[in-house]
Regions:
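N-terminal subdomain of nucleotide-sugar transferases
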Residues: 1-45, 87, 111-113
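N-terminal strand-loop element at the rim of the active site
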Residues: 10, 32-72, 259
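A conserved mid-protein helix/loop that constitutes part of the nucleotide-sugar donor-binding site
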Residues: 20, 220, 229-245, 266, ...
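A structural motif in glycosyltransferase catalytic domains
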Residues: 22, 29, 222, 237-241, ...
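Glycosyltransferase donor-sugar binding loop
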Residues: 225, 253-267
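Nucleotide-activated donor-binding/catalytic signature segment of Leloir-type glycosyltransferases, i.e.
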Residues: 266-287
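Acidic donor-binding loop of glycosyltransferase active sites
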Residues: 297-311, 324
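Conserved acidic donor-binding segment of nucleotide-sugar-dependent glycosyltransferases
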Residues: 340-341, 345-352, 361-367
Length: 411
């Protein structure tokens, strides 16, 4: 089978674990199929050319600059999509359509090629309608300047090479990465899912984390493993650390492992200094999986303090495989993967006091913590790479079968 995979990013260019997950699925599919990847040109000139990967789509920022670039980027994206269709795909599998011109996805959806989606994030709820170009094609009350811009977008869309309809009907198959994201995303009425499945995401390097030999640091060490950006809630971990030291007399340290959004990283350092814990925090920056595993080997706890509704964060599974006690926000799909009290201690979103109290329990209730860690390790076995890749392979085959069957019609 010839499969066209579309994603906003593709390794070695990656923002998080989902892009790495995508590349694992592509590698598996290539064992029995021809696969072409269409992705963004992010870091395109510095990224080595890869067989079967086209880095052609413009990656758009979610701001005024991105909106200004969107019309011409959409024109280019449509041309890229049509070139990809000329390759002769028998199935299109869209992995992540966020931050790329969704005009490309609209062209693919309007073709006769069966179309499936892997949904790991919230973007699918606003597909086409929130796109920075196609949203201007919809009727709406706009201020004068915005109305003029929308008129220009509609004029561009009148070109024979475009003529896109954001709300045109679309039959598809959907693989959701958690029941949580399935419940959080509203599927637009013009979309007809003919097949839906929940297939939980899994860590690409699960075996590496499962092989971690625990050597906890002499003093309590808490690890935050993730991007230093607003929605990941590092401030919760920093304030919880301050409470551990000031209210509970626990001289813990916080190890921050992950790439930083520069401005937010500076804000977090300022917060740590104001709270008097600046010297108790180590900033490790971007890490390889091996370096992350080494940090987990020393950790007394892993804190996942996200403020947004994480669909299914892989870091919780990685920590469980490494046998590190988990303290996490009760948001999105976190509790779907690791159940409260049974596998982890969950706290309400943004509640620094509850986060600190959960960390105290982990550090002081040795027997309960040990038992919880063992249960979490067993739970994490449900999220291993081999069975997941088998499941994705079955989904692709079943999606093609469902989408090529005749649609039901009313009598």
């Amino acid at each position: 089978m010839r499969i066209l995979v579309v994603s906003n990013l593709y390794p070695p260019v990656a923002f998080g674990g989902y892009e790495v997950e995508c590349s694992g699925v592509v590698e598996r599919l290539r064992e029995r199929n021809d696969v072409l990847v269409l992705t963004s040109d992010e870091h395109g000139r510095s990224t080595p050319a890869q067989p079967g990967v086209r880095r052609e789509l413009v990656r758009l920022s979610h701001d005024a600059r991105g909106a200004r670039r969107a019309p011409l980027a959409s024109l280019r994206a449509v041309a890229s999509a049509r070139r990809a269709l000329a390759w002769g795909a028998e199935l299109i599998y869209v992995w992540n359509g966020s931050s790329i011109p969704q005009a490309a996805l609209r062209v693919l959806a309007d073709s006769d090629v069966p179309l499936a989606f892997r949904i790991c994030e919230h973007w699918f709820g606003g597909i086409f309608l929130n796109d920075q170009f196609m949203r201007e094609l919809l009727p709406a009350s706009r201020p004068p300047a915005r109305a003029a811009w929308a008129a220009g977008c509609r004029a561009l869309n009148s070109l024979p090479s475009l003529r896109l309809d954001p709300g045109a009907p679309m039959r598809t198959a959907i693989s959701w990465n958690s029941a949580a994201i399935r419940s959080m995303v509203r599927v637009q009425p013009f979309i007809e899912p003919v097949l839906e499945r929940v297939g939980h995401s899994v860590p690409r390097y699960g075996d590496l984390y499962a092989a971690v030999v625990r050597e906890p640091a002499p003093e309590p060490e808490i690890v935050f493993l993730g991007r230093v950006t607003l929605y990941k809630g590092l401030w919760v971990a920093i304030e919880a650390l301050a409470l551990l030291r000031s209210e509970y007399g626990i001289q813990a340290r916080l190890v921050v492992v992950g790439p930083e959004d520069a401005d937010h990283g500076a804000d977090m350092r300022d917060l740590a200094e104001r709270l008097g814990v600046g010297e108790a925090i180590s900033w490790r920056g971007q890490a390889t999986p091996e370096q992350a595993a080494a940090a987990l080997a020393r950790a007394h706890a892993l804190i996942v303090s996200s403020e947004w509704d994480e669909p299914f964060p892989l870091v919780t599974i990685e920590g469980a495989l490494a046998r590190v006690p988990l303290v996490a926000s009760d948001v999105g799909g976190i509790g779907e993967g690791m159940h409260d009290e049974e596998h982890a201690l969950l706290f309400p979103r943004g509640d620094t006091g509850a986060a600190a109290a959960a960390l105290v329990r982990v550090l002081r209730e040795e027997q309960q913590t040990t038992a919880r860690v063992e249960r979490a390790f067993e739970r994490a076995q449900a999220f291993r790479l081999g069975p997941y890749l088998d499941e994705q392979e079955r989904f692709v085959v079943d999606a093609l079968a469902a989408l090529t069957s005749e649609p039901l019609t009313s009598a």
